Structure formats: C-alpha cells, structure tokens
C-alpha cells in the first residue's frame, strides 16, 4: 500500500508539471483537471501517513510477540525468493522518505526564460540545471525504487543480480537524462563502464557460489557454510567476497574511488544529490545483510574462531583504512563544492564499513544500533546540504544577475549567502553535524560508531577513525570559513533589503535583473521560486539535526527494538 501510494504521488506530480499535457486541454477544463489530480496527490499523501502509523503499531507488537517466543522474525514471500524483516523494512522506509525529499528539489529551478532581442522574442529553453519532472524522469525513478527494494529483500542469487542491474541501469540513464548535453552523455557512458566492471565481478561471485553449492537460495548456501567444511567454506567465502567487492566498486569505495569524484563534480546538482546517496544506502545495507546471513548470529562466537573468515576481515580492513585516509586527506586540497562532498562520501563509506566489520567480531546488537543511527543522520545531513546548495544557486544568481541557473562550482561562490542569517544558520548546523559536534545528530552517529568498533577490539581502526574525523573537520571548517568570512570574492554583491526572505514560503528569488545593451527581459522570472515544501523540508531536517537529543531515549528504544530482530 505504501509503495503504491508513492507511485501514485510521483506519477501524478509529473503529469501536473507537464506543461505540454496541460496545453492540450481547453481553458475551461484546465482548472478542473488540475484540481482532480491534486486531489489524487492528497490521497497518496494520506495513504503514506496512514501506512506509517500502521507500521509503527504493527512492528512493535510483532517484535514483542515473536522475539520473546524465539520465533523466526523473517517473512518469506514468493516461494522464498524474497525475505522481509524489520531491518530492511526500516531501510526501505528511510529510502522512500529520502527519495521524496530529493524529488522535491527539482521544482526550485527555472523552467524557461523569455528574452527580447530588439525586434524578436527569443526563447532560451530550460536552464542548465533544470530537469523536467515529466513521466520519463519519474519512470526512471520508479525503476530505481523497485530495484533497491528488491535488492534489500532478495534471498536468491538471481534476484540479487537482477535487482542490482535494475537499480544500476536506471542510474546510468538518470545521469544522461539532460538532452543535448555532451557532458551528460559522457557521464552516463563513464558510469556505465565502471558499473559494468562491478557487475562482471558480482556475476563471477554468483557463478562461483552456484558452482560450489549447486543452489541459488541464500539460506541454503548459508546452511552449507555452517557445516564447517574447510574447502567448501573457503570457496563460499571467496564467492561472497567477489560480490561484496563488486558492490563496493559500484558505490566508489577505495581504492576505486576516482570515478565517483569525477562523476559527482561533472553531473547536474540534482542528479548528484541522488546518485551520491541512494545507491550507497541500499548497497551498504545489503552488504550488512550479507554479513548477517553469512554468519548465523546464534553461533557467532564459534564461527568466527575459524581461520576462514580472516580473508574477509583483512580485505574489509584494507578498504576501510584506504577510505578513511583518502577521504580525510583528499578533501584538504579541494576548492570545489562537489569534490569536497565526494571525499566526504568516501570517508563515510569507511565509517559504514567499520560498523559492518565490527558486527563480524562482536556478538552485540550495538553494531546494528550504530548502523541505524549513523545511516539516518547521514541521510538527513546529505539532504539538507544539497537543498541548501540548490537554494544558494538561485541566491547566487540573484546577486550576479545570471539569466539561467548556474551550478555552484567553487566554495567561494557560497559567499553570497552570508547576508542571509537563516541560510547561514542552516549551513552552520549541517557542517557541525558532519563534524560531529554535540548535541547535533552527527555526534550521536559517530559516538555509537566509535563505541561499536572499540567493543569489537578494533583499536587501531578506532584510533584511525578519530584521526580521520579530526582531519576531515579541517576542510569542513574551511568550507564554513570561506562562506562566512572570506570577503575577497564578494566585491560585486548588491545590497538587497529582502535578503532574509529566502526561506519565507512563496516568493520570487530574483526581483529584478539589470538590462543589458542588447537584451532586456520580457518576463521577470516569475517561475523562479522556492516552494513552500522546500523550505518546510529544510527546516524540518535542521530541527531534527538540532533537537534530536530532546527525546533521545525514545529514539534509542526504537532503534534497539529494530536491532534485536536480527539476533
């Protein structure tokens, strides 16, 4: 019901935003047609809220009624092809919330600008950043949603590969969705080639598992692994290692990370906000599920005394060390916004993998709890910083009298928002949460991450985590310093009496643009507005990041209840 309501919501939103469809209607039917579709959208929103309310009550009762009776808390559907538990359901809910928030960013861009050139009216299409919220764009998003949901619930080797490719191909198309853009097509082809390498490695691991076990169901493979036959266990572990390495290549973990830096920096801002978060959450969550399925947690201590598991621990440790070192040091020399966010994402991949590694060596639900808390705060921080960047793009164009929305490339271009106290406050909160300053949400994520790694006796990795966090805070603070205190690049700012009205719903960002000698505006950019929901989303995430400690005990109880389902 929840998934159906989401599809209804985004499909009808795309239809309403399709200007060509509206123009086909007569003037008398346009108003009624719009109202009818807006009512359908409201129905979709009501279903989503009602589903969340039902899920809250059912999940808690399901936990208490089954965990106390030591029953199997997994739900198998479609002849054991897919498996549901409270963990992957939580991740799916989190992903759906993130996707809805990211889709709302698109509407902040200019649609079309009309410019009068002497005698003729010239239409300068859509801006470089604009992605029309049409049925094609929404179809790609829907296929991506289906792929990530199927991946998180897969209990079959074939369904794993199909789900990964369904998710990956939708992202390949998404990076090249901007028409008549050579850079967009180059990014799509580049992403496709790198993803193909990861798919080959994943397919080799799947074929190796099938060759050894003659079975495609994960439960049966794990049952064979539990027999503790040395040669078979070694080969099964190697097969899973190939799958995990292929998945890590697809999200840009070290040492194969360079492609992600180039892709994020050259892609559209909206696309970057999507491809830098959604595949990362789904793939890392599924790697955690692989570890949980591979090692029966009821006999965890016995299984990890075997030497067969050292290969997995060593390889993950190397990837974590490289990700932490490169992610923390690499951002120090960057002056581009997306490059810094890309290195920050690489650093956070190391954090996530450290939580997963601590789960291997620790029969404790603290690792699951740390993962849930950290991935939740990371999603909130990521969405908030990209919404702020989108608003800053329009704010920057207002000062520079740009005709079309240009991407913010360098950090100093954020200097134009420092006259707006609301945007600066949001930026300080987001950067503080990335650093991990208490009592912000990011502090609790890093706190439980550190506790989990120390309890697992990974003291060297815990020390490296602290050092990398300190080093990364340097470029986070540099990011903030350039924005707030660097006046060298802000000489051409115009005094605007309405600076602080940016976060007030329904207003025109660009009030006026100076006339050029040969060009004058025939339309004062009435479409260049920040909608109510954008400001509400940003405000809501900032309040969650800032005031989550008020009911922190209740949050911990909820994450604890989710965690115990896996043990």
From Swiss-Prot:
It is found in: Mitochondrion inner membrane. The gene is ND2. This is NADH-ubiquinone oxidoreductase chain 2. GO terms for molecular function: NADH dehydrogenase (ubiquinone) activity. GO terms for cellular component: mitochondrial inner membrane. It is a multi-pass membrane protein. It comes from the Eukaryota. The keyword Translocase applies. InterPro entries: ND/Mrp_TM. Its EC number is 7.1.1.2. Its main location: mitochondrion. Core subunit of the mitochondrial membrane respiratory chain NADH dehydrogenase (Complex I) that is believed to belong to the minimal assembly required for catalysis. Complex I functions in the transfer of electrons from NADH to the respiratory chain. The immediate electron acceptor for the enzyme is believed to be ubiquinone. It catalyses: a ubiquinone + NADH + 5 H(+)(in) = a ubiquinol + NAD(+) + 4 H(+)(out).
């Amino acid at each position: 019901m929840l998934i159906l309501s989401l599809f209804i919501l985004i499909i009808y939103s795309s239809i309403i935003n399709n200007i060509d469809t509206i123009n086909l209607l007569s003037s008398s039917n346009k108003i009624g047609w719009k109202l009818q579709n807006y009512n359908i959208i409201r129905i979709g929103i009501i279903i989503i809220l009602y589903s969340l309310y039902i899920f809250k009550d059912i999940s808690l009762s399901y936990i208490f009624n089954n965990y106390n009776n030591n029953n199997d808390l997994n739900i198998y559907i479609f002849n054991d092809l897919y498996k549901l538990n409270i963990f992957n359901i939580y991740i799916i809910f989190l992903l759906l919330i993130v996707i809805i928030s990211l889709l709302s960013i698109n509407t902040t861009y200019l649609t079309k600008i009309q410019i009068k050139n002497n005698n003729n009216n010239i239409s300068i299409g859509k801006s470089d950043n604009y992605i029309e919220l049409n049925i094609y764009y929404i179809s790609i998003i829907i296929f991506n949603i289906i792929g990530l949901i199927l991946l998180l619930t897969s209990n079959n080797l074939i369904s794993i590969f199909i789900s990964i490719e369904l998710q990956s191909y939708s992202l390949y198309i998404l990076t090249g969705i901007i028409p008549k853009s050579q850079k967009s097509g180059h990014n799509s082809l580049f992403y496709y080639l790198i993803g193909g390498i990861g798919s080959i490695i994943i397919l080799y691991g799947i074929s190796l598992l099938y060759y050894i076990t003659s079975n495609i169901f994960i439960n049966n493979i794990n049952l064979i692994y539990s027999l503790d036959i040395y040669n078979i266990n070694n080969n099964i572990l190697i097969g899973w290692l190939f799958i995990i390495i292929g998945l890590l290549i697809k999200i840009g973990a070290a040492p194969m990370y360079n492609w992600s830096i180039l892709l994020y920096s050259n892609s559209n801002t909206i696309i970057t906000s999507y491809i830098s978060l959604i595949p990362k959450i789904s793939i890392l969550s599924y790697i955690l599920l692989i570890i949980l399925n591979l090692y029966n947690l009821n006999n965890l201590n016995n299984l990890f005394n075997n030497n067969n598991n050292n290969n997995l621990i060593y390889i993950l440790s190397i990837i974590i060390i490289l990700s932490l070192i490169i992610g923390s040091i690499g951002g120090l020399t960057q002056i581009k916004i997306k490059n810094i966010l890309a290195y920050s994402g690489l650093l956070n991949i190391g954090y996530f993998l450290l939580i997963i590694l601590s789960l291997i060596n620790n029969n404790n639900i603290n690792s699951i709890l740390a993962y849930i808390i950290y991935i939740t705060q990371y999603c909130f921080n990521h969405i908030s910083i990209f919404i702020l960047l989108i608003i800053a793009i329009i704010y920057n164009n207002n000062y520079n009298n740009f005709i079309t929305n240009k991407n913010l490339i360098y950090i100093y271009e954020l200097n134009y928002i420092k006259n707006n106290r609301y945007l600066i406050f949001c930026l300080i909160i987001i950067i503080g949460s990335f650093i991990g300053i208490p009592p912000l949400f990011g502090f609790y994520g890093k706190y439980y991450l550190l506790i989990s790694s120390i309890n697992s006796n990974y003291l060297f990795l815990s020390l490296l985590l602290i050092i990398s966090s300190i080093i990364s805070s340097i470029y986070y603070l540099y990011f903030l310093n350039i924005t707030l205190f660097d006046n060298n690049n802000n000489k051409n700012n115009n005094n605007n009496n309405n600076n602080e009205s940016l976060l007030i719903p329904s207003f025109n960002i660009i009030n006026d643009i100076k006339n050029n000698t040969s060009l004058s505006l025939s339309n004062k950019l009435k479409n260049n507005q920040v909608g109510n929901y954008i400001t509400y989303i940003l405000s809501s995430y900032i309040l969650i990041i800032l005031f989550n400690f008020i009911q922190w005990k209740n949050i911990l109880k909820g994450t604890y209840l989710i965690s115990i389902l896996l043990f």
